[in-house]
């Protein structure tokens, strides 16, 4: 399997503490990696480091060429004034995304019961999480970095997501 991304002997410091040090990790094509630990142990920091949104204080992050990393953070960055449709597909014409069975299946699986023209700011936390997941999952990524992806999800959505990620 081909190497996609990783890190070697990285250290990350915050102003009041060392988050972690001497961490090394490699992710190959087809890998499924779970990062577990207590609150505040640096799981989100490690994901951000691997995704390229944070630089280490020491060590190095490795990427195979232009590997595309899709990131789902703990909190969404959806525009509350946008409609669900705008948040999910942006300005992409309907004939482009609606003609793709994969995209239609993801929308139906996670957001089929959410009105397409509803404003994101009017949605519940679980609905917002599902919209953010749809936005991410319809993308074309080499690596998905999901930070607590089941937060705010009901059992049906968790089951759908687990089946989809198999």
Summary of predicted features, one role per range:
Residues 1-166:
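ABC ATP-binding cassette signature C-motif
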């Amino acid at each position: 399997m081909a190497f996609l991304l990783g890190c070697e002997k990285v250290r990350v410091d915050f102003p009041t503490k060392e988050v972690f040090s001497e961490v090394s990790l490699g992710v190959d094509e087809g890998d499924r990696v779970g990062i577990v630990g207590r609150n505040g142990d640096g799981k989100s920091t490690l994901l951000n480091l691997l995704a390229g949104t944070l630089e280490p204080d020491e060590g190095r992050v490795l990427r195979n060429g232009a590997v595309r990393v899709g990131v789902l953070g703990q909190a969404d960055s959806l525009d509350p004034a946008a409609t669900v449709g705008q948040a999910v597909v942006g300005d992409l014409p309907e004939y482009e995304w609606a003609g793709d069975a994969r995209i239609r299946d993801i929308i139906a699986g996670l957001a089929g019961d959410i009105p397409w023209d509803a404003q994101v700011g009017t949605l519940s936390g679980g609905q917002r999480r599902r919209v953010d997941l749809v936005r991410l999952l319809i993308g074309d990524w080499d690596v998905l970095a999901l930070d607590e992806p089941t937060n705010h999800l009901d059992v049906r959505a968790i089951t759908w997501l687990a089946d989809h990620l198999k």
